[in-house]
Design a protein with these regions (language model features):
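Conserved N-terminal phosphate-binding loop of PLP-dependent enzymes in the Aspartate aminotransferase
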Residues: 1-141
């Protein structure tokens, strides 16, 4: 149907970089402990954040899964939007801004989760927890 000198264009036609990236991702998932590592590091980060709040006597709750979690301040449990509306969103935002000053960049929206990826190292978790502790201590409620 298509003769000499005729090209067929399309958004996803012949997307060699995309296929190469997908192949590399599948290879890593097949050969490395990606999910186990994400769960372990995410749990460590979640537990560390919770411990920091607990040590400072701050009521909070952790939500989600280790590789994709969030937290809320001022509530022990959140099961619906009304409960979330009662949380200390301004305090959350102040902590986020203090974190950004220290090189950690979570989303400003407390409903958005923190995402981990396989590239995050144990040192990244350590550095994040240090920045989190400093940020919580630096921000007044």
């Amino acid at each position: 149907i298509i003769g000499q000198g005729v090209a067929q264009g399309g958004t996803y036609n012949n997307n060699k970089p995309g296929v190469a990236a997908a192949w590399a991702t599948l290879t890593i998932l097949e050969n490395e402990p990606v999910m186990k590592t994400l769960e372990q590091r995410g749990k460590r980060l979640m537990d560390g954040i919770s411990d920091i709040f607990t040590e400072d006597g701050i009521i909070h709750c952790m939500n989600g899964y280790p590789a994709m979690f969030s937290y809320a301040v001022g509530a022990e449990k959140i099961t619906n939007q009304r409960e979330w509306n009662e949380t200390e969103k301004d305090y959350y935002l102040a902590i986020v801004e203090a974190l950004m000053e220290r090189g950690v960049m979570p989303d400003h929206d407390a409903r958005e989760p923190w995402f981990l990826c396989y590239a995050h190292s144990e040192k990244d978790i350590d550095d994040t927890l240090t920045a989190f502790s400093e940020s919580v201590k630096s921000v007044s409620r």
